[in-house]
C-alpha cells in the first residue's frame, strides 16, 4: 500500500493525517497550540511550539497507522497563512515570536502606505489590499523593533518565512529555505504576475531580499526530511496555504468552481483559472495552489465571524451549554420570527470591509425567544456567505464567465444541516458536502501525491472526490431575494451602531 502524510498547521492546533491513495483517512493526531496575547490587538505564537506540536503529531499519526517513514510516498504541508517567522540561519532559532495573521500591530504602517498612495500599485501587483493581515508589514515591524535584526538581515544572517517555510527548514535540518506560490502570494511582497518577489515592493517596505525564501510551485521538490526527524527520509512534495489547499482538496480545479470553509470565520474561494481577475466587489485576488508552473488564481472573501457566533451564544448569552445544541434550539422555531442578526463583533470583512461596524440584532418583538435569536445567529453565517458568493458571481459575469453553479463546503460548521439547507435556499444553487470534510489536509496530500507520481493529473483527483450530501434549494427566488434585501438593510444599520 502507498500512503501520504499531510501536516496541517493551523492557528489553534497542529494536526497530522495519514491518507491512503483514495483520499481516505488512515490515522490522525492533533495537539493544541498555545496562543500568546502580549497586548490588545497583538497575537503571537512561539515558533518552537509550532515545530514541537507539529512534529509530535506527525510521529503520533505514523505510530497510530502502524507505518514507518519508508511507507510514506510523500509528505504535504498546509498552514495558517500570513503568520510571520524570522530566524537565525546559523542556529535555526527564531529571533522573535511568530506574528500571527490576526495581529494588528502593523496597522499604523499600513495607514502610512495608504496615505502615500500605494494602494493601487500593491493591488495591481499582488491582488491584495493594504492591510496588517498580510506578512509584509509584520516582517517590517520585526526588522524595526527587534534589536540588531535589520543589520543581521542585511548581512544575510536571517531567514523569513511563513509557517510552511519554518516547518520545511526544521524538517530538512536547515537544508531548504523555500515556500510555495500560494503562501508567497499572501505576503504583500510577491508579484503574482511574474511569480517572483517584487523588488519595488521589497524596497517600499525596506526589506532585504536576502531574507526571502525560494518560491516553488505547490507540487514540487521541497526537499527531504532529515532521517532523524521521522525515522527516515520522506520527500516533501506539496505545500499550500490552508484556504488554497482546501480549494484543491475540494477538487475545484477550473474557473467558476467555489468552496466555502465554515470555521470560526468563513473563507470562500472561487477558482478563476489562469486569469488574474481584480474584483470590483470587495474581494481579494490570490494565487490558487499551482501544481505546475502554469498560473492559477482565485477570488477570495473572508467572513470574520462565522462559527464564532455559536461560541457567543454559548459563552456570551449562555443560551446553550455546548455548540452541538444550537441546531436543535434553532429548529424549535419555524423561522427567525423576523429577527436579523449581524455579528459584526470585530467589524465586517468582505465584501463590505467595514472595520468600525458593530454587531446588531434587529426585529425584536415581545414574542421573540432565545430560539429565534439562535436561529438568526445561525442564519447570519449563511447571509454573510451568500453576500460573498453573490459578489463572486458578479465578478465572474463581468469578466465574461458564468455565475457559480454549485458551492462545495467544508469546516466544522458544515455538519449543521439546518445551516447548509438555508445556505442553499439563499443562494438558489446546490450546496454540496464532501465525504471527506478534512479537505485542507487532503489538498496538501493530493499535491504531494502529484509531485511524487502517485497521481498523474488533476482529472484523476476529480474522480476521487465524492459527495456525502447535496442540499438543493427549496425556497423560491423571490423569497430568497427578499431575505437578502432584509440582510443588506440590517448591514447598513451597523454603521449607525458603530
Swiss-Prot record:
Domain of life: Bacteria
Sequence positions that bind sn-glycerol 3-phosphate: 11, 81-82, 133, 242
Pfam families for this protein: FGGY_C, FGGY_N
GO CC terms: cytosol
Known catalytic reactions: glycerol + ATP = sn-glycerol 3-phosphate + ADP + H(+)
Gene Ontology annotations of biological process type: glycerol catabolic process; glycerol metabolic process; glycerol-3-phosphate metabolic process
Top EC class, one word: transferase
Residues involved in ATP binding: 11-13, 264, 307, 311, 412
Record-listed E.C. numbers: 2.7.1.30
Positions that bind ADP: 11, 15, 264, 307, 412, 416
Activity regulation statement: Inhibited by fructose 1,6-bisphosphate (FBP).
Family, per entry: Belongs to the FGGY kinase family.
Function: Key enzyme in the regulation of glycerol uptake and metabolism. Catalyzes the phosphorylation of glycerol to yield sn-glycerol 3-phosphate.
Protein name: Glycerol kinase
Amino acid at each position: 500500500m502507498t500512503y501520504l502524510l499531510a501536516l496541517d498547521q493551523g492557528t489553534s492546533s497542529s494536526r497530522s493525517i495519514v491518507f491512503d491513495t483514495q483520499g481516505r483517512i488512515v490515522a490522525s493526531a492533533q495537539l493544541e497550540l498555545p496562543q500568546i496575547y502580549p497586548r490588545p490587538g497583538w497575537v503571537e505564537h512561539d515558533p518552537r511550539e509550532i515545530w514541537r506540536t507539529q512534529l509530535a503529531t506527525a510521529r503520533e499519526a505514523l505510530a497510530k497507522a502502524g507505518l514507518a517513514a519508508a511507507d510514506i510516498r510523500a509528505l504535504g504541508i498546509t498552514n495558517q497563512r500570513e503568520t510571520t517567522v524570522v530566524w537565525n540561519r546559523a542556529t535555526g532559532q527564531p529571533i522573535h515570536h511568530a506574528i500571527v495573521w490576526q495581529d494588528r500591530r502593523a496597522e499604523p504602517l499600513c495607514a502610512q502606505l495608504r496615505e502615500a498612495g500605494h494602494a493601487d500599485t500593491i493591488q495591481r501587483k499582488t491582488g491584495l489590499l493594504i492591510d496588517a493581515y498580510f506578512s509584509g508589514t509584520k516582517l517590517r515591524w520585526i526588522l524595526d523593533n527587534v534589536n540588531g535584526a535589520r543589520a543581521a538581515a542585511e548581512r544575510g544572517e536571517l531567514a523569513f518565512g511563513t509557517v510552511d517555510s519554518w516547518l520545511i527548514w526544521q524538517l530538512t535540518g536547515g537544508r531548504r529555505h523555500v515556500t510555495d506560490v500560494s503562501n508567497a502570494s499572501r505576503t504583500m511582497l510577491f508579484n503574482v504576475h511574474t511569480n517572483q518577489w517584487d523588488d519595488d515592493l521589497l524596497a517600499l517596505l525596506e526589506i532585504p531580499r536576502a531574507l526571502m525564501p525560494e518560491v516553488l510551485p505547490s507540487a514540487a521538490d521541497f526537499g527531504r526530511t532529515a532521517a532523524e526527524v521521522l525515522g527516515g527520509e520522506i520527500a516533501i512534495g506539496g505545500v499550500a496555504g490552508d484556504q488554497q489547499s482546501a480549494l484543491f482538496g475540494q477538487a475545484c480545479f477550473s474557473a467558476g468552481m467555489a468552496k466555502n470553509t465554515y470555521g470560526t470565520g468563513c473563507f470562500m474561494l472561487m477558482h478563476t483559472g489562469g486569469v488574474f481577475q481584480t474584483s470590483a466587489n470587495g474581494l481579494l485576488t490570490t494565487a490558487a495552489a499551482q501544481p505546475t508552473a502554469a498560473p492559477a488564481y482565485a477570488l477570495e472573501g473572508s467572513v470574520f465571524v462565522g462559527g464564532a457566533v455559536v461560541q457567543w451564544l454559548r459563552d456570551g448569552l449562555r443560551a446553550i451549554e455546548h455548540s452541538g445544541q444550537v441546531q436543535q434550539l434553532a429548529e424549535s422555531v419555524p423561522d427567525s420570527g423576523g429577527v436579523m442578526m449581524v455579528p459584526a463583533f470585530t467589524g465586517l470583512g468582505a465584501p463590505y470591509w467595514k472595520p468600525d461596524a458593530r454587531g446588531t440584532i434587529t426585529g425584536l418583538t415581545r414574542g421573540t425567544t432565545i430560539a429565534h435569536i439562535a436561529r438568526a445567529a445561525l442564519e447570519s453565517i449563511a447571509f454573510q456567505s451568500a453576500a460573498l458568493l453573490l459578489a463572486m458571481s458578479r465578478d465572474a459575469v463581468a469578466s465574461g464567465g458564468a455565475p457559480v453553479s454549485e458551492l462545495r463546503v467544508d469546516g466544522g460548521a458544515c455538519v449543521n444541516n439546518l445551516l447548509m439547507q438555508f445556505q442553499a435556499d439563499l443562494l438558489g444553487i446546490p450546496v454540496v458536502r464532501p465525504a471527506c470534510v478534512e479537505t485542507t489536509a487532503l489538498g496538501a496530500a493530493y499535491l504531494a501525491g502529484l509531485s511524487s507520481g502517485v497521481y498523474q493529473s488533476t482529472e484523476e483527483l476529480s474522480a476521487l472526490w465524492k459527495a456525502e450530501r447535496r442540499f438543493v434549494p427549496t425556497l423560491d427566488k423571490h423569497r430568497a431575494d427578499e431575505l437578502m434585501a432584509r440582510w443588506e438593510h440590517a448591514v447598513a444599520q451597523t454603521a449607525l451602531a458603530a
